[in-house]
A protein has these predicted regions:
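Exported/periplasmic ABC-transporter solute-binding proteins
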Residues: 27-68, 87, 119-124, 129-311
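Periplasmic N-terminal soluble interaction domains immediately after the signal peptide in Gram-negative
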Residues: 113-117
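Central regulatory/effector-binding core of bacterial HTH transcription factors
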Residues: 69-83
Length: 311
């Protein structure tokens, strides 16, 4: 009888202990959230404006070399598609040419109960490229505006990385044409920035519009090959001297070059995840140096401007 009682109590205690272990394990797993990535490990997809592909490829390459357990998969697309991905929750991080508007901030605050983080990490320039055989490589903004809206009657045409939804198109409509429309007989589209470069290389009297990171880095062998096919045009300076300037870093930093825009990240992440880790990386020294070496101008750190030449 005593043996049965002892055995019964032991069985009951074992059941309680097993239940406690299961309960503790469940709580511990919830607190640690092992299913989630951290700031330096895991895998995430990010959506990136295609005009920044060369420099963001460089950022990811260095980040993953520093953190071998981290994998960042960049999907390059138009800026409008990046914002659509953010709304649809198909990505938690995008890299584009603007931050959130007040209306967008309110939308995310209402739907997420927290504000997404965003910040400008670099300044970029929209470069104008021409065929090596073209005699003219100096343009006023009035001349460029006239080519885009067809008011000059000139034989020159323009090519962009798409006819809608790209950041370069938005910049041209908002900042050059001031809301007016393109002349459809004068403006054509390629699928991406590389297509723009190749089109200009094979056609005379065409102005191509691309982000400077596609053709500014002479340490990149592929970009050196581009510069054998096309030339970077000089645009009328915003300064009072009336000179013409190319998108050198000094001209980007001082806004002497007339077509400067920002590079922003927008992050929809409310824990210390891989998106935040990558955002911190491109914000601080190593990432800022990569922007510098890619001939953009860093927005978060001060650097000495060195002499550089773009063909």
């Amino acid at each position: 009888m005593i043996v049965k009682l002892i055995n019964g109590r032991m069985n009951w205690m074992l059941m309680v202990a097993a239940f406690a272990v299961i309960l503790f394990s469940g709580c511990s797993g919830h607190n640690e959230r092992p299913d989630l990535d951290s700031s330096n490990r895991g895998t995430i997809h990010i959506s990136v404006d295609e005009s920044f592909k060369p420099v963001i490829d460089s950022q990811i390459q260095v980040f993953e070399a520093l953190y071998p357990k981290a994998k960042i998969i960049a999907d390059y697309k138009s800026e409008a598609e990046c914002f659509k991905d953010l709304i649809k929750d198909s990505t938690r991080m995008i890299i584009v040419t603007r931050g959130l508007t007040d209306e967008e901030e309110k939308f995310y605050k209402d739907s997420l109960t927290f504000y997404p983080a965003f910040d400008k990490v670099a300044n970029d320039a929209v470069a104008v490229i021409v065929n090596n055989s073209d005699p003219d490589s100096l343009f006023s903004m009035d001349k460029i505006r006239g080519i885009l809206d067809g008011s000059t009657g000139d034989k020159q045409t323009a090519v962009f990385d798409g006819l809608r939804e790209t950041s370069t198109i938005r910049f041209a409509i908002d900042s050059i044409l001031k809301g007016k429309s393109f002349d459809p007989k004068k403006v054509f589209a390629e699928k991406n920035s590389l297509g723009v470069i190749n089109y200009v290389a094979n056609h005379k009297n065409v102005l191509g519009f691309v982000g400077v990171s596609w053709i500014g880095n002479k340490e990149d062998t592929s970009q050196l090959s581009f510069l054998k096919k096309v030339r970077i045009a000089a645009l009328e300076c915003t300064c009072p001297e009336g000179t013409f300037v190319k998108p050198y870093q000094a001209n980007i930093e001082r806004r002497r070059y007339p077509m400067v825009r920002g590079l922003y990240y927008i992050l929809k992440e409310n824990y210390n995840g891989l998106g935040g880790g990558f955002a911190n990386f491109i914000t601080y020294e190593k990432g800022q140096l990569i922007f510098m070496r890619s001939y953009l101008w860093p927005a978060k750190m001060n650097f000495t401007i060195r002499s550089a030449t773009l063909n």
